[in-house]
């Protein structure tokens, strides 16, 4: 009877923990600098693992900047869609709904072409493994490490009480 109770508790715990491990992450583009000119967004993005369901949060002064979602060709040439397609609230949240490459630029003056205000990321499927492990400070790393430790403890408890 006690062993079936342990198995039930372990099963419920695994379900709850697996939902925590796949929780969406909000990425503040540029961290504390936000969406601004003269910032290296390539370097900012390189150690992050973006997954379907995550959100990009663009924080900026709406009187000075905007955000356009563009394709790779428009990204390379810093060409923009019509102005009415710009995101311009100053706190734009973009949910990453599909996997693949995503491109974002600022459409104000020369911010994209001369001031490097552009971002390209690769979005992975929800359960896809990361191409390489991110640094330990990354949100996904912390959750994954915690999940691994908790799972090891639960397996050890199950073996002891089985």
Swiss-Prot record:
The chain crosses the membrane at residues 142-162. It is found in: Membrane. GO terms for cellular component: plasma membrane. Induction: Accumulates in roots, in a RAM1-dependent manner, during colonization by arbuscular mycorrhizal (AM) fungi (e.g. Glomus versiforme and G.intraradices); the expression level correlates tightly with AM development. It is a single-pass type I membrane protein. Keywords: Copper, Disulfide bond, Electron transport, Glycoprotein, Membrane, Metal-binding, Signal, Transmembrane, Transmembrane helix, Transport. PROSITE patterns: PHYTOCYANIN (PS51485). This is Blue copper protein 1b. It comes from Medicago truncatula.
